[in-house]
Curated annotation (Swiss-Prot):
Belongs to the SEC61-beta family. It is a single-pass membrane protein. It is found in: Cell membrane. Component of the protein translocase complex. Heterotrimer consisting of alpha (SecY), beta (SecG) and gamma (SecE) subunits. Can form oligomers of the heterotrimer. It comes from Picrophilus torridus (strain ATCC 700027 / DSM 9790 / JCM 10055 / NBRC 100828 / KAW 2/3). This is Preprotein translocase subunit SecG.
Length: 55
């Protein structure tokens, strides 16, 4: 008769949990607002460049 083991975990879920616990952020932490502001500033610079230096 097979032994009934009640301590078994869901194997694929355990691997994901272990993966996310070991993940580390190695890059610089940037505020999301800063990314938006940089994008807006770049768009303004490109539009001004098109006005002052038409091709």
């Amino acid at each position: 008769m097979p032994k009934n083991n009640t301590n078994e975990n869901f194997q694929s879920g355990a691997g994901l949990i272990r993966y996310f616990n070991e993940e580390e952020i190695k890059g610089p932490a940037l505020d999301p607002k800063l990314i938006i502001y940089i994008g807006i500033a770049m768009a303004v610079i490109v539009e001004l460049a098109k006005i002052f230096w038409p091709v």
